[in-house]
């Protein structure tokens, strides 16, 4: 089937991202498989082609608007995507910037199986999908404070997400949270949690998502010092009792 790439290419141009024909084909293959598998398992509520292009693919890639996520300096950088779900933003980032090393973490095994199928189908290298909870993986030596970037589009308040994500980031690295446009109250509530976990809010980047009624905010948290060993707390606590 032929797909109109006009919208996708317009969005890529706005973001300053140049993809080869092969990379564009990988995105289309990913789209087709996502929609096919979504018929038998709950991966996404968004399945219409243009909507997936805008609200999944281009939204995932819009992280390049964040200053520290400079696409010219991503070679060899390590990224972990927490609560990746159907692979957003991790898979689009891996397709667009194949020189990055990416770990995709999700708590649902069938989603991880789907991600492994996508990785094989697209012949992606240096990307690993793992099944488990952030609270558990962040305690493991091979994951804790090992990543240049932690990213997440997961729906949770910023205090909770910070406890999930900041422990994975090495000193000098960044946790970048994909948030909706209205972030000010959540940001003020999370300030102390971010500090406790060894981070500092470095930047907030706000913009409208192209051709949609969506506003996107990126909260950029810089890791200044190691996270105390007691964090994250045991599974379930960060969401039930967010750090104040």
Task: Report residues per predicted region.
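Short loop/edge segments at beta-strand edges and connector loops
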Residues: 47, 131-133, 203-205
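Residue-level signal for inorganic ion chemistry
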Residues: 34, 93, 179, 221
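Class I SAM-dependent transferase core
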Residues: 1-76, 80, 110-113, 117-127
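Conserved SAM/SAH cofactor-binding pocket of Class I
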Residues: 61-156, 162
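Helix-to-beta-strand junctions that scaffold the AdoMet/dcAdoMet cofactor pocket
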Residues: 97, 169-171
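Short alpha-helix immediately C-terminal to the canonical SAM-binding loop
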Residues: 111-113, 183, 187
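Conserved beta-strand signature within the Rossmann-like core of class I S-adenosyl-L-methionine
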Residues: 172-182
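SAM/dcSAM-binding transferase cores
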Residues: 188-244
């Amino acid at each position: 089937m032929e797909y109109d790439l006009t919208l996708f290419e317009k969005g890529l141009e706005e973001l300053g991202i140049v993809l080869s024909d092969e990379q564009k084909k990988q995105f289309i293959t990913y789209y087709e498989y996502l929609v096919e598998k979504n018929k038998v398992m709950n991966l996404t509520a968004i399945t219409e082609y243009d909507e997936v292009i805008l609200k999944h693919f281009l939204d995932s890639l819009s992280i390049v608007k964040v200053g520290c996520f400079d696409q010219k300096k991503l070679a060899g950088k390590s990224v972990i995507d927490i609560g990746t779900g159907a692979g957003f933003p991790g898979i689009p980032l891996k397709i667009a910037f194949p020189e990055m090393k990416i770990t995709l973490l999700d708590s649902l095994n069938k989603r991880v199986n789907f991600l492994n199928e996508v990785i094989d189908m697209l012949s992606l290298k240096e990307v690993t999908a793992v099944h488990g909870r952030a609270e558990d993986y962040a305690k493991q030596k091979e994951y804790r404070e090992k990543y240049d970037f932690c990213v997440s589009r997961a729906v949770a308040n910023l205090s909770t997400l910070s406890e999930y994500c900041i422990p994975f980031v090495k000193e000098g690295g960044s946790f970048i949270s994909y948030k909706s446009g209205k972030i000010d109250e959540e940001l003020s509530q999370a300030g102390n949690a971010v500090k406790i976990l060894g981070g500092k809010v470095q930047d907030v980047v706000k913009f409208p998502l192209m051709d949609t009624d969506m506003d996107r905010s990126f909260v950029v948290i810089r890791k200044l010092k190691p996270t105390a060993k007691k964090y994250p707390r045991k599974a379930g606590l960060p969401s039930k009792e967010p750090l104040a």
